[in-house]
């Protein structure tokens, strides 16, 4: 993958001596939501593609030759239960039954929250702009990549440990946060 989130993770800058442990932890703990593949582990091989999760295909011929038991109008309806089932299966082996959500709202909507067997902690990155706290898209994307890198480097195994994240001017804001939404602010 390329883009602001992945560039901020700076995988190519991981020192050779720690790379095997870095990749092992990432492979066991990081999941990537994909419009084409559904859910991926960091080392899964993929073909280059451009397909957004929000792509609609009402009356499309995409699935015409496939034997599907139901019609899907978009990628959310296609992936919803499949992604949720994988996450439910994988969370069984984790002591902290919490998913730290670093996905964009667009991609996170692909998870069926009514069927997920885990706590969800949404990570939100905000900045002070015109005397208001706002999410600035490009900055939030980079911050999500930095947070993913922090989780891997620090080998985070409990969601509360992410409150120690400090990068690119962001730090945890307890006053704006609650049990399900961790807000990181940069002034």
Regions flagged by a language model, labelled:
Residues 1-15, 22:
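Active-site helix-to-loop segments that bind/position phosphate- or nucleotide-bearing substrates
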Residues 14-178, 183-187:
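Internal, well-folded beta-alpha domain core
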């Amino acid at each position: 993958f390329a883009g602001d989130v992945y560039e901020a993770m700076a995988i190519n800058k991981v020192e050779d001596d720690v790379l095997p442990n870095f990749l092992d932890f990432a492979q066991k703990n990081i999941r990537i939501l994909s419009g084409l593949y559904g859910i991926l582990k960091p080392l899964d091989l993929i073909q280059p593609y451009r397909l957004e999760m929000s792509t609609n295909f009402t009356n499309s011929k995409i699935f015409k030759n496939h034997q599907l038991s139901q019609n899907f109008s978009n990628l959310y309806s296609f992936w919803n239960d499949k992604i949720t089932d994988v996450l439910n299966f994988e969370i069984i082996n984790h002591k902290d039954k919490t998913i730290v959500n670093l996905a964009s709202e667009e991609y996170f909507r692909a998870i069926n929250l009514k069927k997920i067997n885990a706590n969800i902690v949404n990570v939100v990155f905000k900045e002070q702009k015109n005397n208001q706290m706002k999410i600035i898209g490009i900055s939030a994307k980079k911050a999500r990549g930095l947070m993913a890198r922090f989780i891997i480097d620090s080998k985070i195994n409990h969601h509360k440990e992410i409150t120690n994240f400090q990068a690119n001017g962001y730090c945890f804001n307890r006053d704006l946060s609650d049990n399900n939404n961790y807000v990181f602010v940069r002034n």
